[in-house]
Amino acid sequence: MTILIIPQDPSENGNPAVDTIPPLLFPRLKNSYSRRAARLRQLAAKNPLGDYLRFAAVIASAQEIVLYDHPLRMDPRARLEESARSGRPPLDINTLPRDAHWQRLLHSLIAELKPDMSGQALSVLENLEKSSSVELEAMAGALFSNEFSQVSSDKAPFIWAALSIYWAQMAALIPGKAYVKAGEQRQFCPVCGSVPVSSMIHVDGVRYLHCNLCESEWHVADAKCSNCEQTRDLHHWSLDSAAVKAESCGDCGTWLKRLYQEKDPAVEAVADDLATLILDARMEQEGFARSSLNPFLFPGE
């Protein structure tokens, strides 16, 4: 059983029980994208992939603007009730109907980004701008179904950026309307069903996986593989960054990055993952498959 998000009776005040370790942290959207952009720019200064990190920072900055220009108004209680009945995440990417809001976010994002783009990136934005609603829906559906060959890798980050704002806005509306019940099988986000981008080791040593879509974080015991939950044959790998390591599992053959706030309080789930691709290459050489997905780095066609 995964982490369950259960509708809260209006007469209830808070959770029925308080866990020592909160199993789920919903997104705190205030300045979240601007913090990511700042971290990307900081990491770009001494990184061989600096140009791409700065490109990602421009997108993150635009996400911050679009987030506040297009607030979302919805009552999540119906989704929470359906989730309780079905056992699926309330914002399940495989079943939740997408309304027109996410495409408005995308077009606003494109308008915000075009003045800062040139060359191939500008051509991609102009192409997306001309895409029909049906075409955009098809691309979103393909990304959510892991059919990455159906969406060019240069379009995917822009589409995902808009979808991420939409899902994060929905997720941020859940606190106060539900309580969380801990469970097992936590390799997928309990809020939306997407995969993590990396794991954050908080200052107190508690590990949370950070969703690559809705920006929620969920707790996974540190002694378990974040993908298959086995406890044997786990190994940590690092190169030149003490704050970033990779955890591999010999049972399922996957790996996921671990970002340590104690080593560097500024670590950010998406930015630090993207800035340490040399570690990805090492893990691939060792024969392990990545169990996560960075929103700025999609598999090629």
From Swiss-Prot:
InterPro entries recorded: FdhE-like_sf, FdhE_C, FdhE_central, FdhE_N, Formate_DH_accessory
Keywords: Cytoplasm
Transmembrane segments: none
A GO term, aspect molecular function: ferric iron binding
Gene3D superfamilies registered for this protein in UniProt: FdhE-like domain (3.90.1670.10)
Major site of localization recorded for this protein: cytoplasm
PANTHER family xref list: PROTEIN FDHE
Biological role stated in the UniProt entry: Necessary for formate dehydrogenase activity.
Protein name: Protein FdhE homolog
Species name: Erwinia tasmaniensis (strain DSM 17950 / CFBP 7177 / CIP 109463 / NCPPB 4357 / Et1/99)
